[in-house]
Amino acid sequence: MIAWQAAALILVGVPEVLLAQSAPVPAHPAAQDFSEADRLRGGYGPYRANNDLLYYQLDVRVDTVRQTLSGKNSIRFKMLKPGRRIQLDLVRVFQIDKILLRSATGAPRALHFERAAGRTVYVDFPETLRQGRIYTIDFYYSGRPVEMGRFGGFVFRKDPMGRPLVNTACEEEGASVWWPNKDQWRDEVEGMEISVEAPSDLIEVSGGRFQSKQELPDGYTRWNWKVQYPINNYDVSLNIGKYVHFGDSYGDLSLDYFVFPEDLEKAQRQFAQVKDMLYAFSRFFGEYPFPNDGYKLVEALYSGVENQTAITYGNHFENGYLGRPASGIGARFDFIIVHESAHEWFGNSITARDRSDMWIHEGWANYSESLFVEYMWGKQDAITYINTGKENVKNQFPVISTEGVFSTPPADQYKKGALFLNTLRSVLDDDAEWFSLLHDYYQHFKYQTIMTSDVLAYFNKHTGKELTPLFAQYLRHAAIPVLQLKFNAAEHTVGYRWAAEEAAFDMPVRVGRRDDWQLIHPTAEWKTLESPIPMDEFEVATDLYYIDVSKQS
């Protein structure tokens, strides 16, 4: 935004701390202020780091009448270091019935376990597990889930017609709200199997490829699914309801949709948008990441979550997001279809290694919305669309939060993350190079867990530019940079410099008149530009760069 007044300095939304060039605003409480449960849950301590996840086989039964859950998770892992203990996670509302170590030569052996702070479960072995060896344990549990987090985690509900409905949504609270696992983001299984026993009058849908179902003698049906790609824990899903199914295809990719019967016709119309989305994102990033598992949308009562290959959808089969906006660019497409599907590339295929770097999911997915707009309606509409997000950015805390503890980054990770990427595009000032970078960035990191340092190193290397100060200013500091302008009408000059918390910040920016921009290269030191443009007509391309501007005469 630009604020100006002759003979005065006006700054709108610019903290005094920024102009004083003082230390960054702290993001969240310091690491020592977090609880032991937060440190165990968010850290990658020795009993997580000593093993590498290989495979899960999750087998559960859901009782929709008693609202209970029981079953086991078989966990296969390789020891990276010798040890006698590993760390797993399960919320305390569940009872741990037993944990068994499989043996190739005899009966399974019961293992000792200890529940520590929060949801931590230490599993102890009678002998030292050898480095490089592969082991499998069966973790049996039972209990009644308790709703947690924004969308509930594991939720028993009734659909609008009063029929039983069960959905999962646990990105915020973690998968251990409903099943035992190594609940962190750094280490992912290479694949998994999901088997769910549900009442036979209902349909169960999980991520992965449908394998089979078996009618059981007690009124339950067992649904079997197989995930054939790496998957993070929170993306493992379970949905049980009175669903009807309809299918389609996009080339060789299967498209499967599960909705309430009364919503079938609306869904058939609204979900036609999926093909445009798939084409756009495949064009920008590469093919859909999980072709062998297919693409699914599953109706839910909350707005939607990016469960891998089984995205939950609750946007009322309308464009926009839950009825907003009523007009404008955002009203031209279904936000949930576009945003949550973007997570298949950014969040599910590429996953942040630590929650502190969650902008790698949300900032990139939010930016992908503007790319969809650009594909459908052109670049100018995309720029307009992405700039509508500015009103939602608070700039109170850095986008990247405290690493190594359980801490959710601020909501700015969404819009500010996207605005940063739009700014980066403008800095590079070469759309052909930008789109090539986006495609190659995704291809380079797909099916991996990464940190911001990896993103930065990639862009530094492949642009040949030193982008470290730019990344640091937008992601590791709270405030955005201010372009300070000082006008001398008599001499027809404009002084300019950056006021930014990152000392080496030196981003180029376009100024002057919109139909004839001039590129300047401000630093922290004053420079001078000859310009006959009066102060009240002198523009800055704030739609291309996420900055504040101050004008002074």
Question: Where does each model-flagged region fall?
Answer:
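N-terminal, polar/Ser/Thr-rich
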Residues: A20-S70, D97, R157-P164, T468-P469
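Extended, low-hydrophobicity, Ser/Thr/Pro/Gly-biased non-transmembrane segments
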Residues: S35-A37, D138-Y243, L544-I547
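A surface-exposed beta-strand-loop module
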Residues: V25-A27, R92-K158, D218-G219, T528-I533
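Surface-exposed beta-strand/loop patches in extracellular or lumenal glycoproteins
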Residues: S74-V93, P180-Q184, V189-P199, S453, ...
